[in-house]
């Protein structure tokens, strides 16, 4: 069994590879697909067979995927939808043309809620895979709990967790757990033609985060609910770079306030056997 994995130098791709190796997958059956040739040696030293291709180069993608029975396609990080849709079209049609037997496509959870404005491309890619008849598993990842790290670090120091979330629920879970779920899909049988939404088993609020952080650190942390401009100012006043603070509030906290991340289910915990509550996730994130 040969497995091609795109985005292998990224956080998710790398964690999928590590979990596959932990599960006993032979390193010589893993084909990391990477853009930067300079990073190939890192994989080759571990017995893997890296191949060089970018999402823009259909021919290189064909060569990279050739001989792979299974493939993990991690959605493009590019935010321009016109570019993303072409990149993903290239990857899917390349996989189809070389006879990939099982395509695991990793996109965004709850695409119908349009949390980021990227979801139409995710859905178009799923429809393309269906139209070509490639056996698939669609993994729709929720937002990574890891995105909260900088906010939680500041709150642990200051005792205040500022947000413009309206204390609405969110369903974020650890990237590590999502990588484990993808590896399980590859390692087990019976996941073809299925769609999995990977989120926390129960949604939680910033109040819950503050409580969990208090329990974890031993320092009382309170959630301070405020407006977006004040949330950005509070984060920057605590030492966060202003651009990063604006991204957190505009791209993440505002969608939370608009209830874009409320759906939840047990699929992730069924794959990993691990809890997804805030306290557990915080301990894992900072250990």
What do the predicted segments below correspond to?
Residues 2-25:
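N-terminal Rossmann NAD(P)H-binding glycine-rich loop of SDR-like oxidoreductase domains
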Residues 164-168, 196-203, 218, 225, ...:
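Glycine-rich Rossmann NAD(P)(H)-binding loop
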Residues 267-287:
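Amphipathic terminal alpha-helices
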Residues 32-97:
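NAD(P)H-binding glycine-rich loop region in Rossmannoid oxidoreductase-like domains
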Residues 148-154, 185-195, 261-262:
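Glycine/proline-rich active-site loop of Rossmann-fold NAD(P)-dependent oxidoreductases
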